[in-house]
Amino acid sequence: MFVDQITLELRAGKGGNGVVAWRKEKYLPKGGPYGGNGGNGGSILIEAVTNMYSFEEYRNLRFLKADDGQAGASNNRTGRNGKDLVLKVPEGTLLRDAATGELIHDFTKDGERIVVCQGGRGGKGNVFFKTSTNRAPTKATPGKPGEIRLVELELKLIADIGLVGFPNAGKSTLFNTLARTEVKVGAYPFTTLHPSLGLVHQEGMLYQKPWIMADIPGIIEGASQNRGLGLDFLRHIERTRLLLFVIDISGIERHSPEQDLKILMGELLAYKEELKDKDMVIALNKIDQLLPDEREERVALLKQQFPDQEFILLSGLTGEGVDALYDLFKSKLSE
């Protein structure tokens, strides 16, 4: 199950109590204080990792707690420190304070790690309080409580390529072709109910780092006002390096391709105007359903209405035009 938002209560460990104890040896009838300090409570850390793409493993949890520190002991022994708890999250995770909405950290790289809740300090045993004037202190202090924090985790996928389009534009079929995977495909709206990630290898570049591609669930008119799957998934578009708009040029499923493209771009810019500066390519999909003359006519109309856009013709079903798309990825993403 894809989970890209979650709220958790994080509880760091309590420090162990210091103890009052006395040195008791056969030839030291008046032995002094011998109580040790408590161990520190475990802290909670969050670390970004690759190969993790949602918060699914945390979805049934309400809170997470680190270990408490152990109490001190006689013979001036310090209690064991509580074990830290490290939460793994995907790259692209935003960590916020749930109470204030304050952004605590934006995890963008593998291995980034921060302390979110500090463990409590261990209490002091009576050895700590021994002085020249108080050689037999009876005082010890309890451990400090660990920090407690309610946090929100929000994921914005980091991908090289983001596939964007209306439901049934053929995104999932194209995704399967490019990533050589099997995303569910069907002739009804919202076949893709959550973002899917795949690796795109071009023939002849198997020893190079593949591109990460995200199939974003179908966007509908009004998505920027949270219609359909709306804002839940529009945020995943923000961090992709290249947006690949997938438009059904056949016009069979919906209204005209030019109207689809106009609405789609309008929704993205209504969500966040800064997206206009992102690199975009328009993939005119399902050309296998058109005769050559029909293709030329519709492409000419689109280029007339969108003269500044870059178009590529292809068929995710038959593979026609896919090699040219690979070449385009290479030129765009190698810059």
Swiss-Prot record:
Residues that hold GTP according to the record: 165-172, 190-194, 215-218, 285-288, 315-317
Any Gene Ontology CC annotation: cytoplasm
InterPro entries hit by this protein: G_OBG, GTP-bd, GTP-bd_Obg/CgtA, GTP1_OBG_dom, GTP1_OBG_dom_sf, OBG_GTPase, P-loop_NTPase, Small_GTP-bd
Localization annotation: Cytoplasm
Necessary cofactors: Mg(2+)
All residue ranges annotated as the OBG-type G domain in the record: 159-334
CDD domains the record matches: Obg
GO biological process: ribosome biogenesis
Coiled coil: none
Residues annotated as binding Mg(2+): 172, 192
EC number of this enzyme: 3.6.5.-
Gene Ontology molecular functions: GTP binding; GTPase activity; magnesium ion binding
Domain Obg: 1-158
Keywords, in A-Z order: Cytoplasm, GTP-binding, Hydrolase, Magnesium, Metal-binding, Nucleotide-binding
Domain of life of the organism encoding this protein: Bacteria
Matching PROSITE patterns: G_OBG, OBG
Subunit structure, interactors included: Monomer.
Stated role: An essential GTPase which binds GTP, GDP and possibly (p)ppGpp with moderate affinity, with high nucleotide exchange rates and a fairly low GTP hydrolysis rate. Plays a role in control of the cell cycle, stress response, ribosome biogenesis and in those bacteria that undergo differentiation, in morphogenesis control.
Family: Belongs to the TRAFAC class OBG-HflX-like GTPase superfamily. OBG GTPase family.
UniProt protein name: GTPase Obg
